[in-house]
């Protein structure tokens, strides 16, 4: 066991826990975006950063282990400023209209939607190439959750991965194949962990587009017949 101080409170915890684990055990509201209980923590989004005295940079709580003697601040002015900036940058570059948890975070941190007015927004055509789900990468914030559950964290299918570099980075299939041409088994786990609606059940998407359940059934039947030929 180790002893540390978090937000002024001294506590003893089991060795091997992350700072996020400790914070949650204390009931602290440390926000996360890329982190999910079903995936391996990777520290990509940096929303869970906390301030550790003696460390110059803020530390991602999801991957940094609690250490003996640490003095941690989960909501200092520096932490709040960093989280707010991350949210404002995300909001200025992509469509977060269906990201309910992130919308709640933006209200909590009182973000300014106009802070980065000249930011280039991520644009992408909706990919509707399979009967299970659609892919709208204009809503994708590259949290990596879908890639992880498609790979070692759950399915071991490896149908999707990162492609491109810098601002052009996006989630895609190898050689830009359609989903039916990949190793995807349509398990739906990627859709389940997506925090923004970038991956969405196809039926839900078509209903939002104004189609009736009957029209969707006819559409799916036609797709199955074409596939059988």
Residue ranges and their predicted role:
Residues 11-68:
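N-terminal cofactor/phosphate-binding cores enriched in small/glycine residues
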């Amino acid at each position: 066991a180790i002893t540390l101080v978090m937000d002024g409170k001294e506590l003893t915890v089991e060795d091997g826990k992350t700072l996020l684990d400790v914070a949650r055990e204390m009931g602290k509201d440390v926000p996360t975006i890329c982190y999910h209980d079903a995936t391996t923590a990777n520290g990509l989004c940096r929303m869970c950063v906390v301030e550790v005295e003696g460390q110059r940079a803020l530390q991602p709580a999801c991957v940094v282990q609690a250490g003996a003697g640490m003095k941690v601040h989960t909501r200092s002015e520096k932490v709040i400023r960093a989280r707010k900036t991350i949210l404002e940058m995300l909001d200025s570059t992509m469509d977060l209209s269906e990201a309910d948890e992130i919308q709640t975070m933006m209200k909590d941190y009182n973000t300014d939607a106009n802070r980065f007015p000249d930011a280039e927004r991520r644009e992408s055509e909706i990919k509707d190439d399979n009967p299970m789900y659609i892919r709208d990468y204009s809503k994708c914030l590259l949290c990596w959750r879908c890639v992880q559950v498609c790979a070692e964290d759950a399915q071991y299918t490896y149908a999707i991965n990162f492609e491109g570099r810098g601002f052009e980075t996006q989630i895609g299939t190898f050689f830009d194949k359609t989903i039916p041409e990949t190793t995807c088994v349509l398990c739906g786990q990627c859709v389940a962990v997506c925090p923004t609606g970038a991956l969405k059940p196809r039926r839900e998407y078509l209903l939002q587009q104004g189609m009736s359940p009957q029209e969707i059934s006819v559409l799916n039947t036609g797709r199955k017949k074409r596939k059988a030929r």
